[in-house]
Amino acid sequence: MPLITLPDGSERRFDAPVTVRDVAADIGAGLAKAALAGRVNGRLVDTSHLIEDDASLAIITDRDPEGLEVIRHSTAHLLAQAVKDLFPSAQVTIGPVIDNGFYYDFAFERPFHPDDLEKIEARMKELAKADLPVSRSVMDRDEAVDFFRDQGEEYKAQIIADIPAGETISLYKQGEFIDLCRGPHVPSTGKLKAFKLTKVAGAYWRGDSSNEMLQRIYGTAWPNKQQLDDYLHRLAEAERRDHRRIGTELNLFSIQEDAGGGLVFWHPKGARIRRAIEQFWFDMHERAGYQFLYTPHIANLDLWKTSGHADFYSESMYEPMEDDNQAFQLKPMNCPFHVLVYKDRLHSYRDLPLRWAEMGTVYRREMSGALHGLMRVRGFTQDDAHIFCREDQIEAEILRILDLTLEVLQAFGFDDFDVNLSTRPDKAVGSDQIWEHATAALKAALEKKGLDYSVDEGGGAFYGPKIDIKIRDAIGREWQCSTVQLDFNLPERFEMEYVAEDNSRRRPIMIHRALLGSVERFFGVLIEHYAGSFPLWLAPVQVQVLTITDRQDDYAREVADRLRNRGIRADADLRNEKIGFKIREHTLQRVPYLLVLGDREMETNTVAVRTRSGEDLGSMDLNQLSERLAGEIASRGRSHLED
């Protein structure tokens, strides 16, 4: 007679073992119809799961985050069933849930084409409409291996063969299709009402480039058509803003395969933006009391052994290079170099805090399949800073860092943040006292700044607690950029010291800090946030001077020179093209201001001003215009003229 306790604390007793579906029906017909799965004593199960003893139970519907995951996982299986129906020789491999959707990898003799995806999706809709019951069964490992080998599914057999002997293997069946899965799944395929296949790509079996290439079909699934349509709209908007496409259109950067994937080439316009970003960064840090370092790109292998990178980070580092009987490696991080600068001389407690910053280029080994434009690269510039301070200075330094972080991010147009504090994990270096004091200092600083934050208990690195700040872009996506990380490990490894007030030697506290993260990645985020229409202070060309005929060429050169002398990035287009063609071309290049020069403007020493949005601002005196533009650039705001 199981006693079922529901999330609201109410209880229901049954005379015999009951399924999750039975309990939902006992509560109400509407809930029974909506039920997708259950959570029994904290574990997700199918609605067919039999409850024999007293238990807590939550009925999972499409309103629950777990319900959406069940829908997506079940839709991945629906995809696999459709592929097997249409292409019987295809072998199924894995089909996990990912952010906003799912994928499934197939081994097939040829690549899937877009028209294949249309056929597969149509078959999925037929299978969903058929409302096929989904049932779970179990086998032992060896039986399951034999079963899938008999089906010609060698990849599934390999997956199961890697599972420890003695473990029970669960299988799910819908129609004639059977697949390996832990579950849970929806009760029937009719619960899958809103899905879309989005793309196909190559993927190596088990992510290993030495293995065979598979076909990965991506898709998305939602509780209803409205949510699906909303997501597809966001997807289309993200595609419109894709930094790789815009970067090519605006001639900002490229990845040259002749040089190697994941290595960024900054073109002149992109370099202009990078210089603007970096100059602002240097100015802000100078004002905040930082000093700047420049450090090498390689170091002796012994340094990476001392820092721990050789033991714990070697998979992300490039192989050592032998030279003069020494082994050198490209740096994956700047931190040990800053430590060496600190150790170059003995410091007093009066010297602290020391705030050192560097735009340091680092190199990390990435699988080619993981590379993605500017967002995931092999060589990138980190806006690193390290603060060396006393324990009693932690809170004040964290406050200063938060002030600087928010000011910098807001200057780039990001005002919406998610803040997370990660605390001590089970295995950690440093005393309980220092962890408690440091964590309390981080919390106090966040609260003094009035920042809402979530706490990830036990989610910190083994060497110290940290604060992560995620920004939201124009279409609501989150990007991890800023990190504040305390480190109790490197000061110990490198035996860092300062002379305390009582003449004793003590370890300094080391704070790692990045505001932008990777400059390349942050640039990619900026491109997508603004869809290439950068605010005036960041635009690679802020003003484009356009002539109607060659009679205005000298005046155009003069106008461009005068603007450049005011620190405004201005170019002159003197080509023998129609003015309408020039206006359209530079509008597509997202130039904030177009100055059209004809005979009248030349005679009156004025300029006709247009914005990239197409607004005609009329004739203006150049001095007046340059004053206003220079003011806007200096304030790093959006142009009031364009607004």
From Swiss-Prot:
Subunit structure and binding partners: Homodimer.
Alphabetic keyword roster: Aminoacyl-tRNA synthetase, ATP-binding, Cytoplasm, Ligase, Metal-binding, Nucleotide-binding, Protein biosynthesis, RNA-binding, tRNA-binding, Zinc
Residue ranges of the region described as Catalytic: 242-535
Organism this protein belongs to: Thioalkalivibrio sulfidiphilus (strain HL-EbGR7)
GO terms classed as biological process: threonyl-tRNA aminoacylation
Requisite cofactors: Zn(2+)
Residues annotated to bind Zn(2+): C335, H386, H512
Free-text comment on the cofactor: Binds 1 zinc ion per subunit.
MF term (GO), any: threonine-tRNA ligase activity
EC number(s) reported in the record: 6.1.1.3
Protein name according to UniProt: Threonine--tRNA ligase
GO cellular component labels: cytoplasm
Protein family membership: Belongs to the class-II aminoacyl-tRNA synthetase family.
Keyword rRNA-binding: no
Catalyzed reactions per annotation: tRNA(Thr) + L-threonine + ATP = L-threonyl-tRNA(Thr) + AMP + diphosphate + H(+)
UniProt xrefs under InterPro entries: aa-tRNA-synt_IIb, aa-tRNA-synth_II, aa-tRNA-synth_II/BPL/LPL, Anticodon-bd, Anticodon-bd_dom_sf, Beta-grasp_dom_sf, TGS, TGS-like
Keyword Heme carried by entry: no
Role, per record: Catalyzes the attachment of threonine to tRNA(Thr) in a two-step reaction: L-threonine is first activated by ATP to form Thr-AMP and then transferred to the acceptor end of tRNA(Thr). Also edits incorrectly charged L-seryl-tRNA(Thr).
Location, primary (coarse class): cytoplasm
Subcellular location field: Cytoplasm
Domain TGS: 1-61
Enzyme superclass (EC): ligase
NCBIfam families: thrS
